[in-house]
Amino acid sequence: VSKQPGVETELLDIATMPLPTNDAGEAIKESAFSVAMDRADAIVIVAPEYNHGYCGLLKHVLDSCLKEYIHKAVGIVGVSAGPFGGTRVIQNLLPVMRELGLVTIFWDVNFSSVQTSFDAQGQLTDQSYVRRIDKFLKELLWMARTLRYGRENVAI
């Protein structure tokens, strides 16, 4: 996606960021995460599935920002070592995204048996995912551009 004209990407690993210290998320306000969310037109969340859900750290970090998310596109990628490819984590995140003011795209990407889908350098080895990833990224960019136009030009 970063090869698209006018598109900049940034990878944020929430496991390496300061944790919110209370329900208001004061430790993360004005942090790299908050600033990146404010600047972003779109967000891709890659979430592993744990016991049919997502990890508490993801929920805690997501809840630490609110105004930064309003009317921004989000795409969700589910990851699982099992056969379901994170389908259940995606289903669990959808209502959370809506509550946060994010606009989900209709394409998801699900990586089942993730341990065999990538090599040691993180490169995709299972080419059957390429078409779905392409559709996912095209939809995400379309939604991001459409919502950006709306945020900048349409008063609510």
PLM segments and residue spans:
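N-terminal beta1-alpha1-beta2 submodule of the flavodoxin-like/Rossmannoid cofactor-binding fold
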Residues: 1-65, 123-156
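Mobile beta-alpha loop/short-helix "lid" or hinge segments that flank ligand
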Residues: 10-21, 67, 100-120
